[in-house]
Amino acid sequence: MAASCLRPAPTASAQMMTRSPVAGLPRPCSALQRSGCTLQGAFGTFAPQTTRTFVVTWAKGGVMDAPTTTQQPASGVERSQKRPPIYKVLLHNDNYNKREYVVKVLLKVVEQITVDDAVTCMQEAHETGVALVVACPQDNAERYCEGLRLNGLTSTIEPGGC
């Protein structure tokens, strides 16, 4: 009686017919029945295991379709980004603006400059004719130069970095 309640263990071919080796592909049983191909395990026997690899072959033994894998870049890989080119913002001396006004405009237009740096920049422009205000990316340099010009100072930019 106990023997009648037991079912025979599924065979390897029964397991192959019910499971699809790759998600999203047609089940092997229907594809194999239509094409006349055989299904072979890559490791020979079909012992219980977590991963199975199957190869579909033609009757003459040629491989019909080989699995392809795509390698994803490691998540920890950092991509190097190019830094934008650096431009110098130059302040030129003029005989029209007072020194205090030049310092005030420098502090207003260039956010990262300190009072001491603004005074030093103004003094250098007065003594040598030109002074380096700041070296920064091109878009910031153009904005600073335009801001200085709109406030009546003479300013230029040129490529080059520190």
From Swiss-Prot:
Keywords for the protein's UniProt record, in alphabetical order: Chloroplast, Plastid, Transit peptide
Among the record's GO biological process terms, what is one? protein catabolic process
Q: What is this protein called?
A: ATP-dependent Clp protease adapter protein CLPS1, chloroplastic
Task: Give all cystine bridges in this chain.
Answer: none
Q: Which domain of life is it from?
A: Eukaryota
Q: Which gene encodes it?
A: CLPS1
Q: Tell me the compartments it is located in.
A: Plastid, Chloroplast stroma
Q: Where is the organism placed in the taxonomic lineage, from the top? A: Eukaryota, Viridiplantae, Chlorophyta, core chlorophytes, Chlorophyceae
Q: Spell out the InterPro entries in the cross-references.
A: ClpS, ClpS_core, Ribosomal_bL12_C/ClpS-like
**Which source organism?**
Chlamydomonas reinhardtii
PANTHER family per record: ATP-DEPENDENT CLP PROTEASE ADAPTER PROTEIN CLPS1, CHLOROPLASTIC (PTHR33473:SF17)
Cite a GO CC annotation: chloroplast stroma
